[in-house]
Amino acid sequence: MAVVPASLSGQDVGSFAYLTIKDRIPQILTKVIDTLHRHKSEFFENHGEEGVEAEKKAISLLSKLRNELQTDKPIIPLVEKFVDTDIWNQYLEYQQSLLNESDGKSRWFYSPWLFVECYMYRRIHEAIIQSPPIDYFDVFKESKEQNFYESQESVIALCTHLQQLIKTIEDLDENQLKDEFFKLLQISLWGNKCDLSLSGGESSSQKTDVLNSLEDLKPFILLNDMEHLWSLLSNCKKTREKASVTRVYIVLDNSGFELVTDLILANFLLSSELATEVHFYGKTIPWFVSDTTIHDFNWLIEQVKHGNHKWMSKCGADWEEYVKMGKWVYHDHIFWTLPHEYCAMPQVAPDLYAELQKAHLILFKGDLNYRKLTGDRKWEFSVPFHQALNGFHPAPLCTIRTLKAEIQVGLKPGQGEQLMASEPCWWTSGKYGIFQYDGPL
């Protein structure tokens, strides 16, 4: 196997990884501490003095974490026994074994960025679970819900579009169906712009009707493998026997508006018979500010169902029905909130890898998935995506992301360098997007 390049890390002063560790992560921790402060009276109402003491304890643990980060202290093992604690601590030992540092300790700015950023969110969770009776509290819940509420007009526009489309779907010829599929894929792509971890937890909602912007946004799609997705799924549809299934898996990213765009796409896949089942993979714990948990998934469907617009509530009712019928299935697994790159999945989570192998197509949403797919490494821009996956090929897969990290592979020779010369922030601003496919053609 070819030599893999070094990991992105905070060692590179001025890099996006460096600025994330130096500025964005402390900002997120400060916001989490503030959120706990603001819920003090709620904790008192629900749990009395015990709730207030728990809030103080959680804040103290989080303040300690912020100090460790800002002073580049060694990264310490997790202490609270949880289902993944041992795996995390083994991974920390593994990272330490790779170091040349004189004291052999992993530190925030010298360890791989992917590891320390995941570790920070896992330590936030540890601070909460160490603080009963408020150990159920999702410190990011408010901002996820706000993102959904602030995107209402866009949600209504998408639900209306979908319901009108479903009415006429049987009359569409193959090219028209393909056009609609491409449209909803692009909506799911641009929905990925709404990422609260990039904005430091500040509002990042969708206030304009993305449907009307698709033509204008096309030049910003750097890699467009939508044709491969169409030919794969339309071929599955044509060759499917009566009782057989076509499974599309969506490895989710953000809750709120982006999740709505993913559910709209999933609805279309069933209505068009391009798929017979859609499986969603989310996070087991609150993660990267806006990532989807089972609570977020169920909450959002409930909100859409009770929306004050007939097509919106029709979508919500349909989605609830899909879940009941088993046509939509939500899964979570601890692997998605571990620091490992995905090429380690067969060893670390063989059960999950075996599950993914049952898919006809896996859609990986967003930046964190892309970073884990490619190992978050300093790849050359023109390295083939298949190579950067480093042996991770459970099923045909496609990554759908707007670029918000200094990693991108599979570009034409010179394309990345050209963008870098004209627009230095091209790969971190969320302005550009990709549909990047790996699988049989």
UniProtKB/Swiss-Prot annotation:
Name the record gives this protein: Damage-control phosphatase ARMT1
One annotated GO molecular function: fructose-1-phosphatase activity
Cofactor: Mn(2+); Ni(2+)
Swiss-Prot/TrEMBL domain comment: Subfamily III proteins have a conserved RTxK motif about 40-50 residues from the C-terminus; the threonine may be replaced by serine or cysteine.
Catalytic reaction list: beta-D-fructose 1-phosphate + H2O = D-fructose + phosphate; beta-D-fructose 6-phosphate = dihydroxyacetone + D-glyceraldehyde 3-phosphate; L-glutamyl-[protein] + S-adenosyl-L-methionine = [protein]-L-glutamate 5-O-methyl ester + S-adenosyl-L-homocysteine
Record keyword Cytoplasm present: no
Matching Gene3D superfamilies: 1.20.930.60, Uncharacterised protein PF01937, DUF89, domain 3 (3.40.50.10880)
